[in-house]
Amino acid sequence: MIRFTPGNRIELLRSGGEFFPALEAAIDAAESEIWLETYIFADDSAGCVIAAALVRAAERGVDVRVLVDGWGAKHYLTKRLEHALRAGGVRLLKYRPEVAPWQFRFQRLRRLHRKICHVDQRVAFVGGINLIDDMNTPHQKPPRLDFAVRVTGPVLAPIVATMQRLWALVELVQFERSDVPLFPEPIAVAPSGTQTAKFVIRDNLRYRRDIERAYLAAIRTAKREIVIANAYFLPGLRFRHALIAAAERGVSVTLLLQARVEYRLLHYASRALYGQLLSAGVVIAEYHRSFLHAKVAVIDDRWATVGSSNIDPYSLLMAREANIFVRDPHFADQLRIELLQMIDTGTQHVEPERWAERSTLTKVVTWIAYGVVRVGMGVLGYGGHEWFPRRRARER
């Protein structure tokens, strides 16, 4: 199990308005190296600002490396922006750039969904924010709401090693000569604060369930309050049982979920689970004010997480994800205040009585969606009985 490390400084960044200036400032201060991983690198106002900063760094001799997901690159990284980065001296790789629709393979679903950057092995950024403007929300009401953290201290060591290892792996499978070891030596980073934290990833080899396990460990020991904000929420059986058990032992459990429909199938499949959760006393607040993209949580005013991982089959079973977990009352309180304000000002609560009275057609649609997702995951070989059990208690 990955241990918490003391001596860190973790700064909460709220959406692009705080994240992009902090990231640009760190890039502009870089002296030796910049490593960046992202799912989306858009050719828009925000993406171009960061791209220009990366090129400036490369032009002054900084080793700049960008790893972008192949699907994200296909849909957002324009040829113009890609050319500008490469021509400016940025070393750019694409993770799984398979895009041919007639060559379907299960592995194509294993995307690079994490959003990480480290500069000079002294400061890092981890979170759920892609390199895309908050106001650039196709088919959704802007702005996009999300979180990231700026990190200094010993927890940088696994961040650096993780990024080096994946870069070397991508070069290896793409038959490129790599100057990065596949198994890098750990670095030593001096303490810079008083906060205890750990960096946790999900991959398809050694760390398949680590993010989920970190969540479950905190939920199962919660004593007072659990607040989870997640844009795409379709948890497996163990996760649901942990939330229900917490609510039944008197813990206040609140889920802040996206109300607006982005992916219809996942949206309605998620709602098929509402009845079971509501019956146990879990509070569900759907965010209507704008586009919720957050993947964060606070438990008992002392534990918090910020990262890229949703609580759904894609994030917990297939994609490469990364979260920071923090044990610190001050940080947890900061994030909790943000979430409670979002709940107070931008949500509608799902009332158990009204939910039970929804139309038969609505019930059928949600369960068909859930069934389609279940069958699809089974065909792909993911999930098994733990995620979609064949027999379960009746869920209303």
Predicted ranges, named:
Residues 1-396:
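Charged, low-complexity intrinsically disordered terminal segments
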